[in-house]
């Protein structure tokens, strides 16, 4: 009979742990793509961009991985834990329609870091739209101006055009990094 209180305690702890498991699983986004074990060329480009541009908070590359159909995902970027996360509807719009979104995020309550985000079509060396590139810049001093929007659009365009010169084809982004 002396074992009963200990057994009840163990059972209570186990039940509490099991009860919170679905909540933890719900917090993590469901991945729609798994990257290969080795670093891909796209990740190398992302790493090089971040190293060369301290004004950036992040860069992410999005699109449909080769061999997939309508699986829009982040496949490289400065947030490795997000690789394989499904794209949001606005990400897909940029990829499909070739539009650019200028998103000054200095008033968002969910973002802990103030930033200026530009979502734009990613291009290859030939100028073909091949997906989405997202640049998040450190917050400008005067973010509420059209001059800030023009400045960040110009910076993002220059970065994107420079990146395009390093992309022979979309498929090459998924080749092993050298």
Residue ranges: model-predicted function:
Residues 47-69, 161, 165-173:
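Short N-terminal helix-loop-first-beta-strand/juxtamembrane motif that initiates sensory/input modules
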Residues 21-25:
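Sec/Tat signal peptide C-region and signal peptidase I cleavage site
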Residues 10-20:
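Bacterial N-terminal signal peptides
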Residues 40-42, 77-107:
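Extracytoplasmic/periplasmic sensor domains and loops in membrane signaling proteins
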Residues 112-121:
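A short beta-strand signature within small-molecule sensing/ligand-binding domains used
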Residues 131-132:
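Short glycine-/small-residue motifs
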Residues 1-11:
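Bacterial N-terminal signal peptides that target proteins for export
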Residues 29-43, 137-178:
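Juxtadomain coupling helices with adjacent low-complexity linkers
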């Amino acid at each position: 009979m002396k074992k009963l209180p200990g057994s009840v305690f163990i059972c209570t702890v186990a039940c509490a742990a099991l009860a919170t498991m679905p909540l933890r699983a719900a917090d993590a986004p469901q991945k729609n793509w798994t990257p290969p074990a080795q670093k891909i060329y796209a990740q190398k480009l992302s790493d090089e961009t971040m190293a060369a541009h301290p004004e950036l908070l992040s860069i992410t590359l999005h699109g449909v991985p080769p061999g997939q159909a309508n699986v829009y995902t982040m496949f490289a970027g400065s947030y490795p834990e997000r690789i394989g996360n499904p794209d949001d509807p606005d990400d897909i719009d940029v990829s499909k329609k070739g539009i650019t979104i200028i998103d000054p995020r200095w008033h968002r309550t969910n973002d802990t870091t103030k930033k200026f985000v530009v979502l734009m079509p990613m291009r290859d060396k030939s100028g073909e739209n091949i997906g989405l590139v997202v640049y998040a810049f450190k917050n400008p001093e005067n973010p509420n101006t059209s001059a800030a929007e023009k400045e960040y659009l110009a910076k993002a365009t220059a970065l994107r055009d420079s990146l395009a010169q390093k992309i022979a084809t979309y498929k090459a982004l998924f080749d092993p990094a050298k």
